[in-house]
């Protein structure tokens, strides 16, 4: 009797272990497949979202490109006609910034004395003009507030030098720049202002 019970107990334990191992294996396989399916779904969703946002970003970049190129044409025309004064340019930039929600900042920067020959008169007149008096205001819009600050010592910065040296449209890689105290990830689209083959500045 004891031997029979012992044998039965051994069989029971053995069968139970087999069932447990089998169940565990099945659970592991199901879990593994579930993880795999979840990962595939995540990749598919990420791919779908990347396509969606890439189209949106491309559309916004194209809109910003058209706006910057249009401003460059307007400023070039004003300069050629002798009608480009600083107040007019500042007003155009402010109005454009308020009307274009996809743009957070505008910059128009000229070579020394290439706008009106009056850099010395405007030297140190902050916040529009820096120590040199060059026309290079950086207009930004953040939380509905427009702000301006002068750009200085920018001749070798990639966004300025790129357009100047190539003589054509220049697009920077995305970079962080502080706008009204807040770091913002942005891309600059820069157009050179060239008159009679002479580079005189940029619109960005």
Predicted regions and their residues:
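Short, Lys/Arg-rich, polar N-terminal cytosolic tail immediately upstream
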Residues: 1-5
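Extracellular/periplasmic ligand-sensing ectodomains of membrane signal-transduction proteins
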Residues: 98-183
């Amino acid at each position: 009797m004891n031997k029979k019970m012992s044998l039965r107990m051994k069989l029971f334990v053995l069968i139970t272990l087999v069932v447990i191992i089998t169940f565990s294996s099945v659970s592991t396989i199901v879990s593994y497949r579930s993880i795999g399916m979840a990962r595939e779904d995540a990749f598919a969703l990420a791919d779908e979202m990347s396509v969606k946002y890439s189209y949106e970003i491309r559309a916004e970049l194209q809109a910003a490109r058209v706006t910057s190129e249009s401003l460059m044409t307007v400023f070039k025309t004003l300069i050629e006609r002798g009608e480009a004064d600083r107040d007019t340019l500042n007003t155009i930039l402010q109005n454009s910034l308020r009307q274009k929600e996809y743009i957070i900042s505008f910059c128009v920067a000229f070579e020394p004395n290439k706008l009106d020959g009056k850099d010395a008169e405007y030297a140190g007149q902050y916040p529009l003009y820096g120590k040199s008096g060059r026309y290079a205001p950086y207009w930004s819009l953040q939380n509905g507030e427009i702000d301006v600050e002068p750009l200085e010592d920018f001749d070798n910065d990639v966004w300025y030098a790129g357009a100047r040296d190539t003589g054509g449209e220049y697009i920077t890689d995305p970079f962080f720049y502080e706008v009204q105290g807040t770091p913002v990830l942005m891309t600059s689209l820069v157009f050179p202002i060239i008159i009679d083959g002479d580079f005189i500045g940029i619109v960005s």
